Amino acid sequence: MPVTAQQVELIPLAIYTLFAVGLIGILLLAARYLGSGKETSEKHIPFESGMVPTGNARHASQVPFYLIAIFFIVFDVEGAFILAWATSWDLLGIPGLVHITLFITVLLLGLVWLWMKGGLDWGPSAMRARGKRS
């Protein structure tokens, strides 16, 4: 079976992949055989920093992390749209500028509305204020 030019171009990638996998395997085996396998009581506590822990490691967090994730997704999509608009500016012209301006304006109005509603207040005082309102 003849070797094509595309297969020849993939040979360096295959060599690099084999080298990387081999190096990872060697390092994992070295860590397994050279490291001490002693089980100590300190390895089973939540903080393995050499200090005796005080308090509970499993405390409830006050920051609503789901909001951070939603904000990240919204502004990440906004960045993708703006990047796509910027790369095709020559084709879109003024109508594209109007569309992206409206898009950013709607997002900013949504951010202002969220701010005014208290959606960005995450501290303990905000949690107490929400508890009093309900």
From Swiss-Prot:
Its EC number is 7.1.1.-. It is an enzyme of class 7 (translocase). It holds the Pfam family Oxidored_q4. The keyword Lipid biosynthesis does not apply. The chain crosses the membrane at residues 10-30, 65-85, 94-114. It comes from the Bacteria. It is found in: Cell inner membrane. It is a multi-pass membrane protein. GO terms for cellular component: NADH dehydrogenase complex; plasma membrane. Its main location: membrane. Gene3D superfamilies: NADH:ubiquinone/plastoquinone oxidoreductase, chain 3 (1.20.58.1610). GO terms for molecular function: NADH dehydrogenase (ubiquinone) activity; NADH:ubiquinone reductase (non-electrogenic) activity; quinone binding. Keywords: Cell inner membrane, Cell membrane, Membrane, NAD, Quinone, Translocase, Transmembrane, Transmembrane helix, Transport, Ubiquinone. The keyword Lipid metabolism does not apply. It catalyses: a quinone + NADH + 5 H(+)(in) = a quinol + NAD(+) + 4 H(+)(out). NDH-1 is composed of 14 different subunits. Subunits NuoA, H, J, K, L, M, N constitute the membrane sector of the complex. Belongs to the complex I subunit 3 family. NDH-1 shuttles electrons from NADH, via FMN and iron-sulfur (Fe-S) centers, to quinones in the respiratory chain. The immediate electron acceptor for the enzyme in this species is believed to be ubiquinone. Couples the redox reaction to proton translocation (for every two electrons transferred, four hydrogen ions are translocated across the cytoplasmic membrane), and thus conserves the redox energy in a proton gradient. This is NADH-quinone oxidoreductase subunit A 1. It comes from Citrifermentans bemidjiense (strain ATCC BAA-1014 / DSM 16622 / JCM 12645 / Bem).
